[in-house]
Amino acid sequence: MIHYLKSFFLYEIVRGMALTLKYFFKPKVTINYPYEKSPISPRFKGEHALRRYENGEERCIACKLCEAICPAQAIVIEADEREDGSRRTTRYDIDMTKCIYCGLCQEACPVDAIVEGPNFEFASLTHTALIYDKERLLQNGDRWEQALASKLRKDYEYR
């Protein structure tokens, strides 16, 4: 019986070493991350951004659909009515530590105001830096507008 267990154990070690050697001589599939970047899918969901119209006016009409549909309750919106009767946001906050990047806010938005952009490098050392206010979201939208617009055009037929 002991001989059987020893031979079984030896067999497993040899089998494991064979598997290791099989992959040892194959080309590496990992990348050297900060210096090399892997391609990103066109439907990648990254850092949030608020978009503007071509004339510079923000797109958000304060319908609060994104706030209502967010499963993590990461979005907080406050709005006021303008003199012309339209509504605009006075406060638009997203707690990125709560966000699960599901994309439901982007799907719910009737005017494509809130989108998830291509940026995935927004780590921070503090919690407060990951609570995005309206100004930060608009800056993200201005910075990534070209990429966001082309991404939405490519995906338009599927929406």
UniProtKB/Swiss-Prot annotation:
GO terms for biological process: aerobic respiration. It is found in: Cell membrane. Pfam families: Fer4_7. Its EC number is 7.1.1.-. It is a peripheral membrane protein. Its cofactor is [4Fe-4S] cluster. Keywords: 4Fe-4S, Cell membrane, Iron, Iron-sulfur, Membrane, Metal-binding, NAD, Quinone, Repeat, Translocase, Ubiquinone. [4Fe-4S] cluster 2 binds at C70, C99, C102, C105. InterPro entries: 4Fe4S_Fe-S-bd, 4Fe4S_Fe_S_CS, NADH_quinone_OxRdtase_chainI. It comes from the Bacteria. Binds 2 [4Fe-4S] clusters per subunit. Belongs to the complex I 23 kDa subunit family. This is NADH-quinone oxidoreductase subunit I. It comes from Rickettsia africae (strain ESF-5). The gene is nuoI.
